[in-house]
Amino acid sequence: MIQVPDTWKFVHVTDIHIGSPESYRFQPGWNNQWSTAAKQIQAIAPELMLVGGDLARDGNTEPQQFEHSIQVLNAVGVPWHVIPGNMDTGNKITDRSSLRTDRDDIACNVTEELLQTFKDKVGAFPWSFIHHDVRFSGCYEIIKDAGLPSAIELDRFLAEIGQLPPSHFHVMLNHYPLFIDGINEDQYDITDPEEYMSWYFGVDPEPRKRLIEAYQKAGVTHVLSGHIHCRRPPITIDGITFCFGASTAMPQFGDHWPDGDDTLGFQTFTVTPEAIDFEFHPLTEVSTRTDGWGPGGHPKPEARAK
């Protein structure tokens, strides 16, 4: 019988955005900051590393970037498990564009082709496994009810994990947070400039409701997310603790909540027989490099010339 240690650790990193100098845009400081995070993680010596998406700067338009992202993750020397993010496979699906002129929201939609490219180049998802007495699962939640083949696969996965034997804890890895301001929040309007960022960052009400129902049936105790590049203190609702993760690349959305903090870093979780305890680790060094280039956000094709 395998002896389960009384205390052990895993880390959650997200939105690391490893870029390439061959691209039309590149921020070398972000890559440097990942190197800093990697050294800090090695010093902690966790048993697992969960990677919550956006491992490449532009995997959705330049999938060759995934190769380097995989190399730097392997170099940490900690077993890792990954799900995609929107910069890897595309944004949540919309049939309407916003009023923003710097992007085409419909053209940014996640597609089955991009999801399959991620599976081919990085790894399969969704997934679920037991480590010690904890079940870990990961899925790309934003495709729920999207009508894609991978969304149908997600439905099967959610039904299957709901039938598995219960575990002491069950950690679910997501990219998008399931909610922005409240678990019962209404639909945000993509065409309202005041609501656009909340629409962009969150999950719409109906898929959110179905995801939470499935998570509850599966005995999920913790949901880890990224995407917003801003952490908040863990929020527990109806037995599920929601953990909003920080980015190692760039801060954003830090002024949206009174308790929001967009300090760059990553999350460590210490597992004991009684609890999973959270600790934030800010980067010990943040790059001051100014030699990057290219536009931010989701530039239209004509803005992607190097």
Task: Go through the PLM ranges and name each one.
Residues M1-P5, H222, Q267-K306:
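A short C-terminal boundary segment appended to hydrolase-like catalytic domains
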Residues I2, T61-F169, E195-S198, R210, ...:
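Extended active-site neighborhood of metal-dependent phosphoesterases/phosphodiesterases
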Residues A37-L48, R135-S137, A146-T241, D277, ...:
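His/acidic metal-ligating clusters that form di-metal
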Residues T7-S20, D133-I143, V171-L173, I240-S247, ...:
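Active-site-proximal beta-strand elements of phosphoester/diester hydrolases
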Residues H17-S20, D88-G90, L178-I180:
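Feature marks short, surface-exposed loop/turn motifs that line or immediately flank catalytic pockets
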Residues M1-F66:
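N-terminal active-site segment of His-dependent metallophosphoesterases
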Residues D15, G53-D54, G85-N86, H175, ...:
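Active-site glycine-centered loops adjacent to acidic/histidine catalytic or metal-binding residues
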Residues S23-R25, K92-S98, D102-R103, G182-Q187, ...:
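Short aromatic-enriched loop/helix-cap "lid" or pocket-rim segments at secondary-structure transitions
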